[in-house]
């Protein structure tokens, strides 16, 4: 790193996806196919400054992973995309999160409609206290009026996409609580995609799962990117390397480096990124 680079802030020294780097200034430019554009995003828990001037472009139809040590802000950043913070008056976001040119932070659009476009799956499997069938149908009924036959087709479609249909097709009337942890997480993914969102957010989706269930979820993530833009938060760097096309490394609320996953893991631009990936830090 030369002397001029050493005085740039972390975002200005960010590595952007191939073909998107402004060589003159070292700043990331928006990919032509960016699905979400984050501009000068700051986030606060009361007076605590949790995210600091984040600038990031999430490529469409790809899997983007957020990595970094606990408390670095990766889950906070993920949850700003569908305004989960709106539930808590002491939390606020400033800046822009653009999707199709619309700033999601200031839009007057009904928040439930926003979350229909940007689905989310949480760290711990959270099936609803109802049947497997109704877990899938519940969200669909909020946004669409389908006949019973159409709903049956949608339920089968979502469970098939989540690689769960063959395991539950004969017990759709049974409680989702009766499924294994891995099956419950796939049920939650099926529930998320049943309303046909454009973006799917996954917050540590495998942290509570065994290795076999984790492998199935990772295979599913690879398949889902053909239809969705996927953003995943993970503490597991091997998982990020296996599953994602792009990776963002965060530390203390700042975006340190962002780029193609292979380049981030093999030849990162920032020493901080290299130290974290190689286990010398974090």
UniProtKB/Swiss-Prot annotation:
ATP binds at residues 68-75. It catalyses: phosphate(out) + ATP + H2O = ADP + 2 phosphate(in) + H(+). It is a peripheral membrane protein. The complex is composed of two ATP-binding proteins (PstB), two transmembrane proteins (PstC and PstA) and a solute-binding protein (PstS). This is Phosphate import ATP-binding protein PstB. Pfam families: ABC_tran. Gene3D superfamilies: P-loop containing nucleotide triphosphate hydrolases. The gene is pstB. One of its GO terms (molecular function) is ATP binding. It comes from Burkholderia orbicola (strain AU 1054). Belongs to the ABC transporter superfamily. Phosphate importer (TC 3.A.1.7) family. GO terms for cellular component: plasma membrane. Its main location: membrane.
